C-alpha cells in the first residue's frame, strides 16, 4: 500500500514537471516574465513590509511614523518652498528640511542662503548640515560652517554628514569628527546631529559618539539596521518626488512624536 502511494506521488510530480517544461517550451517569454514578476513582488514585500505607497510622493513611506521631512542641496536647484509646504497626500505632509550649507574647507552651497530663509518662512523646521572632508582640518571645516549658518531659536542642531574617511584610519577619522563636534557644540550650545549611512556607520563609527543624536541612511528596509544606535532621524529613500522640486529628493522620518520633536528642537532632555 505504501509503495503504491509513493509511486503515485512520484508520477504526479513527474507529470507536473513535464507540464511545466511544456509550458516553458510553448510560452518561453511569458513564463520568464511571470517568474520575474513574482520574484519582484516577493522582494518588494520583504523590503517594503510596513511601508505604504504614497502616489504623489512617488515612493513607499514607512507607515509607523508620523513626522516626515526632506534634505536638499544644490542638486535640487531652485526650490519653490511654498509648494513644498502645501503638499499633502494620504495624511502626509513635510514638516522639516535639512539643508546643505558647507563642505570641506571652503565650499558653500550656492542655494543655501535661499533655502535656509524660505524653508523657515514657509513653516518648515530647518536644519543645516556640513559635509565632512577627511582631508581637511576639522577646525577649518567647523569655522566655515559656523561662519555660514545663522542659527535661530527653533532650528535643529547643527548636522555633520560623515560618509567617507579617505586615507584616514577609522580611529583618526573619529578623532577629527570629535574635534568638529566639540567646536560646533561649544559655539551653538547644542550637541550636533551626526549623519551617516548604515554600512559606513558599522565599519567606522559604531560604538562611538553615543551621546550625540544620530541620523542614519538605510534604504528599503523595515527599520534601519542601527547596531544599537539610538537614531533620531532615518533617511529611508532617495527617490521621492515633491511639488516645487525638480528631480528626486531624499525622504526622512523622525523617530518620535510631535511632542518629542518639539522637545528635541528646544534642547530638552528626555526623562528616563
From Swiss-Prot:
Alphabetized, the UniProt keywords read: Glycosidase, Hydrolase
In this protein, the active site sits at 71, 163
Which Pfam family, just one, is annotated for this protein? Answer: Glyco_hydro_25
InterPro entries, per the entry: Glyco_hydro_25 (IPR002053), Glyco_hydro_25_AS (IPR008270), Glyco_hydro_fam25_subgr (IPR018077), Glycoside_hydrolase_SF (IPR017853)
Note whether Flavoprotein occurs among the keywords: no
* GO MF: lysozyme activity
One Gene Ontology biological process: peptidoglycan catabolic process
Is Disulfide bond one of the keywords UniProt gives this record? no
* Homology family: Belongs to the glycosyl hydrolase 25 family.
The protein's name: Uncharacterized protein YegX
Q: Which organism is it from?
A: Escherichia coli (strain K12)
Gene (UniProt) = yegX
Amino acid at each position: 500500500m505504501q509503495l503504491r502511494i509513493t509511486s503515485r506521488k512520484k508520477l504526479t510530480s513527474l507529470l507536473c514537471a513535464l507540464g511545466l517544461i511544456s509550458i516553458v517550451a510553448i510560452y518561453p517569454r511569458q513564463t520568464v516574465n511571470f517568474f520575474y514578476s513574482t520574484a519582484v513582488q516577493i522582494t518588494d514585500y520583504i523590503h517594503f513590509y510596513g511601508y505604504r505607497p504614497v502616489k504623489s510622493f512617488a515612493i513607499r513611506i514607512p507607515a509607523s511614523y508620523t513626522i516626515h521631512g526632506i534634505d536638499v542641496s544644490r542638486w535640487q536647484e531652485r526650490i519653490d518652498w511654498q509648494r513644498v509646504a502645501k503638499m499633502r497626500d494620504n495624511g502626509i505632509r513635510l514638516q522639516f528640511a535639512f539643508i546643505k550649507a558647507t563642505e570641506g574647507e571652503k565650499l558653500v552651497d550656492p542655494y543655501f542662503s535661499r533655502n535656509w530663509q524660505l524653508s523657515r518662512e514657509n513653516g518648515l523646521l530647518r536644519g543645516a548640515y556640513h559635509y565632512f572632508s577627511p582631508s581637511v582640518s576639522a577646525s577649518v571645516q567647523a569655522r566655515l560652517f559656523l561662519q555660514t549658518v545663522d542659527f535661530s531659536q527653533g532650528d535643529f542642531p547643527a548636522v555633520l554628514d560623515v560618509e567617507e574617511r579617505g586615507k584616514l584610519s577609522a580611529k583618526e577619522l573619529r578623532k577629527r569628527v570629535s574635534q568638529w563636534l566639540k567646536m560646533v557644540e561649544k559655539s551653538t550650545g547644542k550637541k550636533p546631529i551626526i549623519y551617516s549611512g548604515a554600512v559606513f556607520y558599522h565599519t567606522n563609527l559604531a560604538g562611538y559618539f553615543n551621546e550625540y543624536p544620530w541620523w542614519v541612511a538605510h534604504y528599503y528596509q523595515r527599520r534601519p539596521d542601527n547596531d544599537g544606535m539610538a537614531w533620531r532621524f532615518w533617511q529611508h529613500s532617495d527617490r521621492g518626488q515633491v511639488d516645487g522640486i525638480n528631480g528626486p529628493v531624499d525622504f526622512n522620518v523622525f523617530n518620535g512624536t510631535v511632542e518629542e520633536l518639539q522637545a528635541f528642537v528646544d534642547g530638552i532632555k528626555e526623562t528616563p
